[in-house]
Amino acid sequence: MKNLKNIVYSAIVLIIFVGITSCSTNKIKEITENSVQKKNVNVVLADLDWESVKAHNDLASYLIEKGYGYRTSKISGRSNPLRESLKSGSIDIVMEYWVIDKKTYENDINNDFFEELSINFNDYTQGAYIPRYMVEGDKKRGIRATAQGLTELKDLLKYKDVFLKEGEQKPKIISLAKTFALEGQESWKKKLENYNITSEFKMIEPENGEELKKSAIQAYENGEPWIGYYWSPSSMISKYDFIRLKEAPYDKEIYETTGMCENPNYNITIVASPQLKNNAPEVYALLKNYKTSSEITNKLLSISQQSGHISEGNMKKFLRENEGLWKNWVTKEAYENIIKTIK
């Protein structure tokens, strides 16, 4: 009888052990399969031609890779072809989609070309900028004010000779880079034409954002006159002292006809390909929560390299110092994974 009890007891223990082992094996198998599946998914971000989008790409990539185990990559290029790639699904994410043409944007969303996940930020400025020393001078650098009183774009023609360099027939005004969104380029040209600026100034279109930045910085460091399109947040405006020429307050009718007023504050959104939700659901959820501001973007830019990208060491420091910003964007498990990497 005693032997029978021992046999029954041993059988029960064996059944429990096999059950536990089977469950554990299934769980390990599930975790392994999920891990392998994630490693096979490459999340592609559009690395557009301005610094702030590169900085946001680096922040998002770090959270995606370290938090969830997905691979990421970036594709560089111009705004418009990259956005077409987003529609086709060869690009997964655009971290800064400037909603300039709202009708086309909404039409694309309604036709399932891509999906808006979040508004990244919308508290930015853009327009015609000049160095502050042109208006106020700079005693430390021995620069006298050459355009004292120039504070509004409508008055630019009164000061056109200040911008004229020796040997040139017309002064120059620097436009948006050729790689920027076509809607923005067209809006800028319309504005300048109706202010009669294009008849008195030669418009220069930089090949890319880096050339635009280089033009402004070179003039500033030499203490020379400069006028051109720029925006904030940007590393150039945060580092060098430029002022934006004022315009009349934004008016929808004026803006759409002549453009002779402030630009509207477009939403700068995060958009994703239709495939992202199924291919990388955790990434989709993360970006639905992702929201920053011009101030936060300038913080990112302050630690970026000249290219706009951020080193891993600086990114870890940013994440440590701004934990309250990103903690609620990610799941608890992803948060714990990320924390381990930044200590």
Predicted regions and their residues:
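C-terminal motif of bacterial Sec signal peptides marking the signal peptidase cleavage site
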Residues: 18-22
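An extracytoplasmic/periplasmic, membrane-proximal ligand-sensing/linker region
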Residues: 41, 52, 181-199, 210-221, ...
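Short, polar/charged alpha-helical segment
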Residues: 51-70, 189-192
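Ligand-binding pocket segment of bilobal, Venus flytrap-like solute-binding proteins
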Residues: 85, 91-98, 174-251, 343
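A conserved helix-loop-strand patch within extracytoplasmic ligand-binding domains
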Residues: 114-174
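Periplasmic-binding protein-like
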Residues: 118-128, 209-211, 236-286
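A bilobed periplasmic-binding-protein/Venus flytrap-type ligand-binding module shared by bacterial periplasmic
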Residues: 126-144, 177, 265-279, 302-303
